[in-house]
Amino acid sequence: MQLRKALLVIFVAYLLVTDEAEAFWGFLGKLAMKAVPSLIGGNKSSSKRKREIEDLFDPYQKDLDLQRLDRFFSQFQ
């Protein structure tokens, strides 16, 4: 167990001193930025709203639901 801790300390110290550390920490940062919103669950509502806006302003949509349009714009008042 102590050997693992020692190797982990050596590895982290190596990353802090070398140029490869930038790529490693960048990868960990990107991974954390993707994981945190998915754990919280805030990303689902954002994608749902984005999809609703895309559907609302679809130029090929023939039947435009005016009640849905009024509901959408009432959110901004």
From Swiss-Prot:
Tissue specificity field: Expressed by the venom gland.
Which superkingdom does the taxonomy of this entry point to?
Eukaryota
Q: Does the keyword Membrane apply?
A: yes
What subcellular compartments does it reside in? Secreted; Target cell membrane
Q: Which residues form the signal peptide?
A: 1-23
Pro-sequence positions in this chain?
Answer: 49-77
Tell me which UniProt keywords the record has, alphabetically: Antibiotic, Antimicrobial, Cleavage on pair of basic residues, Cytolysis, Fungicide, Membrane, Secreted, Signal, Target cell membrane, Target membrane
A single GO BP term for this record reads: defense response to fungus
Chief place where the protein resides: secreted
Any one annotated GO CC term: extracellular region
Tell me yes or no: is Secreted among this UniProt entry's keywords. Answer: yes
- What is the similarity comment for this entry? Belongs to the non-disulfide-bridged peptide (NDBP) superfamily. Medium-length antimicrobial peptide (group 3) family.
Q: What does this protein do?
A: Antimicrobial peptide with potent activity against Gram-positive bacteria S.aureus (MIC=10 uM) and S.agalactiaea (MIC=15 uM), and Gram-negative bacteria E.coli (MIC=24 uM) and P.aeruginosa (MIC=15 uM), as well as against yeasts Candida albicans (MIC=3.1 uM) and C.glabrata (MIC=25 uM). Also elicits low hemolysis on human erythrocytes (HC(50)=167 uM).
Record's protein name: VpAmp2.0
